[in-house]
Amino acid sequence: MGPISAPSCRWRIPWQGLLLTASLFTFWNPPTTAQLTIEAVPSNAAEGKEVLLLVHNLPQDPRGYNWYKGETVDANRRIIGYVISNQQITPGPAYSNRETIYPNASLLMRNVTRNDTGSYTLQVIKLNLMSEEVTGQFSVHPETPKPSISSNNSNPVEDKDAVAFTCEPETQNTTYLWWVNGQSLPVSPRLQLSNGNRTLTLLSVTRNDVGPYECEIQNPASANFSDPVTLNVLYGPDAPTISPSDTYYHAGVNLNLSCHAASNPPSQYSWSVNGTFQQYTQKLFIPNITTKNSGSYACHTTNSATGRNRTTVRMITVSDALVQGSSPGLSARATVSIMIGVLARVALI
C-alpha cells in the first residue's frame, strides 16, 4: 500500500504512439464475480517486440494496483504502481523505463529481452484495503535469422548421385522445416531428414528433383525462410528420335533427317550411314537420293557431363518404283501425272 498511499512522484502516461492504446482506453472491466486473470499477448514474444499483460475480471472499485516481477509480492521486485483516485504512477526497484501501466491495470512491456521471460504478479488493492493477487507468464525468444541452404552437389547426375542440403545456421530451440516447389516435403523413400531436420538428403536424384527448395526455421515467436535453391540435374541422353518417321523414299527426292534426344546439358550429335561416319550435326541432309542411299541411318548422341551415349538406327529404302503410302518418295511431277491419269479414266467412264 505504500506506493498507493504515499507515491514518490507523479508521472504522465505516454499514451500517444503506443500499440493498443486506443483499445485500452475503452477496455474497462465492468463489475464481475469472475476470477481475476492475466492474459499475455503474445505469450511467446520475439526479442525487441512488445508484450501486453492484459488483465481480466478486475474486482469492483479497486483503489490501485502494483506489478511485481516473479510469482510473489516482493517490494524489492516491484515494477510499477498505480493509484486510481489521482492517476498517480509510482515506479519500483524493478522498473526499467520500458513498462507502461494502464487504468485497467494492464501492463505493456516494450523492447522485451530473454531476461524478461518468466512470471509477473499483479496486486489489486480493494476498497477495504485487502489485496488480491494473480500471476501470469510469458516467454521471450530470439528473432529467427534468415536461413540459407548449402549443398554438397549442385550438379548431380540422374540415377547416380545423392544430394545433401543443409539449412544454416544451427540455432538452439529451433524447428527446421523443408519446402519443395512451394509445398511441404512429400513422403518418399528417396527423401531423408537427419541432424534434427537440418539436413535433407535426396537419394538417387532424378530430373524431376530440380526444385526449388526452401528451408524454414521457426521458434514459438517467429519464423523465417531461406532463398529458394534449385538443382541442375544432369541427365540423358534419352534414346534419340529420328524424324520424319518414313522409311521408304523415291529416288530423286531430298533426304532430310533430324535427330533429337532429351539431355542436360544438350547432347552432341553425329550420323553414320551403313556404319560409315558422316558428320557431327543434329540434322542430316542428302540431296537427290538414289537407290545407293538405301541402308541403315544411325543417330548417335553423347552427353559428356553424364558420360552416357545412346544410338537409334533407322532403315531407309530408296526405290525407283513408287511405293504406296510413301509420300516423301513422290515427286511433284509424279503426283501430277497420277492425278491426270485418274481424271482421264473418269472422263472415259
Swiss-Prot record:
Give an example GO cellular component term for this record. azurophil granule membrane
Major place of residence: membrane
> Span of the secretion signal?
1-34
Excised during maturation, the propeptide residues are 321-349
What cystine pairs are annotated?
C167-C215, C259-C299
Location in the cell reads: Cell membrane; Cell surface
Tissue-by-tissue expression: Expressed in leukocytes of chronic myeloid Leukemia patients and bone marrow.
SUPFAM superfamilies, A to Z: Immunoglobulin (SSF48726)
Q: Give all residue intervals belonging to the Ig-like V-type domain.
A: 35-142
Summarize what the UniProt record says about post-translational modification. Answer: Glycosylated.
- Residues with glycosylation annotation: N104, N111, N115, N152, N173, N197, N224, N256, N274, N288, N309
The reported effect of R78A is: Does not affect the monomeric structure. Loss of heterodimerization with CEACAM6
Please describe, based on the UniProt annotation, the reported consequence of changing R78Q.
Answer: Inhibits heterophilic cell adhesion
Summarizing the function annotation, the protein's role is: Cell surface glycoprotein that plays a role in cell adhesion in a calcium-independent manner. Mediates heterophilic cell adhesion with other carcinoembryonic antigen-related cell adhesion molecules, such as CEACAM6. Heterophilic interaction with CEACAM8 occurs in activated neutrophils.
Task: Return the similarity comment.
Answer: Belongs to the immunoglobulin superfamily. CEA family.
Q: What is this protein called?
A: Cell adhesion molecule CEACAM8
